[in-house]
Amino acid sequence: MTSVTVGLEVYEITRSTFMVSLVGVISLVPMILAGLYGGMLADAFDRRTVALVSAVMAWVSTAMIAAHAWLGLDSVVLLYVLVTVNAVAGTVIGASRAAIVPRLVGNDLLPAASALNSISAGFSVTVGPAVGGVLVAAFGFAPTYTVDVVLFSAAFLGVVTLPRMAPEHDALRPGLSSLVEGARFLRRSRNITMTFVLDIIAMTFGQPRVLFPAIGALVVGGGSITVGALSAAYAVGALLSGVFSGPLGHVRRQGEAVGWAITVYGGAIAAFGVVVAAAHLLGGRASETFSTGILPALALCALALAVAGGADNVSSVFRGTILQAAAPDGMRGRLQGIFIVVVTGGPRVGDLYAGLVVAAGFAWPPLIGGVLIIALVALLLRLVPSFRRYDALHPNAN
């Protein structure tokens, strides 16, 4: 909810899609450092403690964003800082929590665990953006942030009830030696590296969220309601694919499945780009008031984004399973740190890509990006045949 609301608030203050894109871009470098260091912390210390401390940090930053809105400061710089702190904390939480999962379940249950996690995440991001858009339209930014602060408090329960997760073996203390050890392992592990590279491609060229405020204000119309609907459509697709993910546990060629899922994702993003470009060429609808006249374009955009969300979730389930099954426990924290950096940092690079393309005068970044995704995935799967042949029954990092 907060991520959507911050984007709307920055757009309200600046009326600039590029400034909205900077919400994610500015936090990218700190988040990369946090992911790397947080992963080392998860390998060296009790993973439950690392997750709990990070959750407190994330809650405090969310509360400060709400305070900023209540005080009416309208400071884009302060919003950038607070969102960066929140992203840093979230990266460390993700690294430590994901490294915990293989210690709780066996390899045969990892796809099911990943799918269950995707259902939980999908539900939160489905309800969050939709409710966020409606609350902003009805009550404004401050009450919307406050609701998120209250809901975020419930997240502590899941972390507190986890068992202690001390390292199974002696681990290097966080520092350069630990980082180098993880980097060397990753360099030798082509299959794990491919999960990162493919996701970077998908998120860099296929992340249209930074365009949503402008689409709602200038192209499709509908303002914050449209932004919430588009954000929710993506999440609904992810949620539904998680709910019906039972057959994924029987897929052995998981690397090949990742390739197909990301290819479908690229096609869906390209279709979304076609609808947006067509609406733009037809003159757009410069209105932030929701009306039935925008429903055809909004429905087509939402359908494409729902397919994209579903495909992205399937890809995420398999990529996460490959990483957790093929990596030794002593490396999982560091590799999960890199994984979280990729899955959260990639969209921020995608925000910059979309913002720059629009700033250059083009309205078609999703269309161009979707085609690039399809082409690059096909090329990489041909260049790395071991990834296509990856067998879930015989996990192999190489």
Task: Go through each PLM region and give its residues.
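Alpha-helical transmembrane-bundle signature of multi-pass membrane transport and export proteins
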Residues: 1-398
